[in-house]
Amino acid sequence: MTTNLPRRRLLKTTAGATGAALGGALLPLSGSTHAAAHRFAIGDKDFLLDGKPLQIRCGEMHFARVPREYWPHRLKAIKAMGLNTVCAYLFWNYHEWREGKFDWSGQRDAAEFCRLAQAEGLWVILRPGPYACAEWEMGGLPWWLLKQPGDAFLRTRSPAFIDPARRWLREVGRALGQQQVTRGGPILMVQVENEYGFFGSDLDYLRTMRRAVLDAGFDVPLFQCNPTNAVAKTHIPELFSVANFGSDPQAGFKALAAVQQGPLMCGEYYSGWFDTWGAPHRRGSADGAVRDIQAMLGANGSFSLYMAHGGTTFGLWGGCDRPFRPDTTSYDYDAPIGEAGWTGAKFDAYRAGIRPFLAPGEVLPAAPARNPVMTIAPFALTESAAVLANLPARTIRDASPRPLEAYDISRGLVSYRTTLPAGPAGTLEAARVRDLAWVFVDGRPVGTMDTRQRRYKVELAARAAPVTLEILLYTIARVNFGREVHDRKGLHGPVTFTPKAAQPVAQAVEQWEIRAIDFDADGVLPPLAFKRGRAAGPAFWRGGFEAGRGLDTFLDMSGWGQGIVWINGRCLGRYWSIGPTQTMYLPGPWIRRGRNEVVVLDLTGPREARIAGLAEPVLDRLRPELDLARPPSSARLQLDGVKPAFEGEFAPGAATQDVRFAAPARGRQFCLESLDAFDGKQYAAVAEIALLGRDGKTLDQSDWTIAYVSSEEASKEDGGALNAINGQNSDYWHTAYAGAAARNAVHPHRLVIDLGGDAEVAGLRYTPRQGEEGVTGRIRRFRAYVGERLVVGN
């Protein structure tokens, strides 16, 4: 273990011509064995380092998403962009996957990451959770919390959550307390919780979390972050507040100034956005970002780019957007430093935009060179092992399936087997399936279940004799945002079979045998019996390639279906040929000289069992025709004779607005009808819709789905309707504007949400598309409907 590195007074900080505080004071320097302690404080107008103003120019990088061997390279790039601080999440589940067993070794060595940042002249902002979000499995919360009953205890003062969270934070203090600036390290500030305003309103919960961080031994300033429209909701005097946004810094800073005196800071400025499987690759405007960054710096504000460098969600750590949209393995984020650490035009634009705000005499170092890449000639995977023939012998027997967590299974592949008696054709149905399932009768595939569409039914043919029913379930990711983080996996009972009859009666399907391949924390492969040739059904495949040296490459998985890749026993991550990502980043340090073994799990079967290594990634190729088969939709809007629950106009601008109905309305479905937009154009857009109950609180969205949408943009950008109910203000539903789909996409536009059950709706909360004044799609006149069946068909 290395010792802490020293600091020197590199520059004196004075006010520049722009009026911005300069950010070059007291930067870390490598080379000495003694580190000086510093005082960091939050002043009336500035952050103060040893009593002098410090303007924080920060960028986010998650060490868990970057090979340890490349941490220095990425930190050098962050420094070269003009930043003086790196922001780092800790993911609780990454360090405590099994309760009470902490791991800070190797890739998880957060203290070493801090030391390396200090050596590169960077300060550190630490975000230890306990909740993180970050498109990470369960938002960083450990799965074993879900062994406790209930769907409303996470991120609350319930002892079932608070007690293990306190223990986690004590462990963080033990591991990283010496990395604070007060003890000669680089950590300036520590965040408490994360965007709690998106989730709850219990201010005493925030106070409890603050106390837990203090009790863990942190003595640097503590802060909380929230989106602009939630800053006031959860602000408490004991915690400094920063605002998160991807546009309109003036509004964000205004919200901060309304609740506290002190420096202005954007805690997350979105340089791009994350990708989800099956949706277009997302990008962020460099020009708009540079304008906003300069506006913040010119206003004496500080910022943190989310992300400066996104990297890759290696292994099985990817999260899932609500209601259920799994995130891609690539976490490129369209950040200024690309997935493989590359810098280019976007990086150069950010660097040029920040340069005028450097301290006098502060010099930007050159960006590090790209790591070299190599191509790999196509190689065949000639051996396979059927999943159902390679399940472990350990069998769990249960009358009705329960969530995996109840069986102490974390994630992976799970087989559920039982016997169905002879009988007529009918419908097999589970209460819930998390996440995807393939149904077999006597070994023959008969259908799939898919939580993305809440499709938990499969039609079964008549049976002349008893048959073996087997359901193979695959867990993809736990939801990382909203109340849906209570995301218990597996086949949830009761499971029923309803025969086709004049008066059908559902029959319980019971007495299940359950066997699982638990991939655990690091996606460890089970023992597998490979044979030459192609196995039937879901299978593991094995092959390999020779390498003279280890250089970065991008594995082309476009010929495969859906599953996981391992290289030399290391779990590289998930792939899915529906896109938009078609390649998998393989870092050079993970490639051996000589023979390299590759194992691929493919659940739907490869079209060609070959892989090649490419010199560049493919991040933006959609293949919807390769998705799981689903019944064709016959959904039709049916508003004839339905009286609107409300008709009126939204206010202009980007602020969130509450609309209360004259009288509550009851039904299962809600329709927002856009009649026109403020800009007079044919488009409609919504960042977020929530519904209000009589008490003014938002209704639970856990079982919401989109029942119907008249138009959505799906080619130029991800303007899908699900964006309107995913809890994120930074993306949005947008009606079609590109190609043939746009020609008939005119007002009125309708979006129908199925609430998952009967509900009383007393109003709605509408968040317009965010951005500069004049962005397209902000709705002016509208109608709101509530009814039992506003959409007919399936």
Where does each model-flagged region fall?
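N-terminal carbohydrate-binding accessory modules
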Residues: A35-N84
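Aromatic-lined substrate-binding rim segments of carbohydrate-active enzymes
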Residues: H73-K79, C87-W136, L214
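Active-site neighborhood of glycoside hydrolase catalytic domains
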Residues: P164-A232
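Disordered, acidic Ser/Thr/Pro-rich linker "stalks" and the adjacent N-terminal cap
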Residues: R394, D398-A399, N568, P632-G667, ...
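Short beta-strand-plus-loop segments that form exposed binding edges in beta-rich domains
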Residues: I471-I476, V600-G605, E673-G680
